[in-house]
Amino acid sequence: GLIPMFLIIGIWGGPRRVYSAFKFFLYTLLGSVLMLVAIISIYWISGTTDVTKLYEIGIDVKYQNLLWLAFFSSFAVKTPMWPVHTWLPDAHVEAPTAGSVLLAAILLKMAGYGFIRFSLGLFPVASEVFTPLIYTLSVIAIIVTSLIALMQEDMKKLIAYSSVAHMGFVTLGIFTIQQQGIEGSIIQMISHGLVSAALFLCVGVVYDRMHSRLIGSYGGIVTIIPKYSILFMLFTLAALGLPGTSGFIGEFLILMGAFKDNFLVAVLASLGVILGAAYMLSLIHISEPTRLLSISD
């Protein structure tokens, strides 16, 4: 997906599309190079790259830490985890609507799958060793990017930063190495893929008509296009994890798994739920019309 997404952003993106496309390309490429070296090393050590066989024979413990770090370097960029997340807001803002949908719905989830299938599956000992690292980076991502999202006026950028926070919950849940945590992470990935993609589509709809993504430009829009506004509100509530929505199920299971493994980490991560509600509700605040809205359902 690297080259197609690079072309989508670079050719059909916004004014800063070239910068954003190359930033996305370089971050992803550099992370993937280390993983390629790790895959070659696994073949040299084990004589195979067949994942099923590697599960059976296992990988020597003395190599696991280095190999885990090499895979981690790739997955951390693709997730993305703090502090290698800075390419994502730029990519989302400059990408066309279709590009943002693909990025949110598919590409970000590949790293979560990789953590479960390869990091936990091939390097179980190293995964336990580096769990504190994952916890630290995940909690920082959840809190810091949520605070940054609170300050955003651009709807696309707000949703992009919220994606980093949501994926922070995913990595946290995976490395609780608890059934509830991992199941919650899988549900969260599916939920985020659907909900964030829908939000980007909703933003694209109004941007095509109004040529603005500023939250303040859409005051009173519910009186003009009520059907669209209700749909947008439903997806926003799902994104903040309202009980009864898919977002709630994923986050709840992740936090349940985290509380079983590390109480302090779970409490800190819970702050992300409160902050998530704050920045998402800023998208659907009630206000008077701020400009002439000449659009309709």
Where in this protein do the model-derived segments appear?
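Hydrophobic transmembrane alpha-helices and their helix-loop junctions in integral membrane proteins
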Residues: 3-283, 287
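Single conserved hydrophobic/aromatic residue that forms the stacking wall/gate
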Residues: 285, 289-297
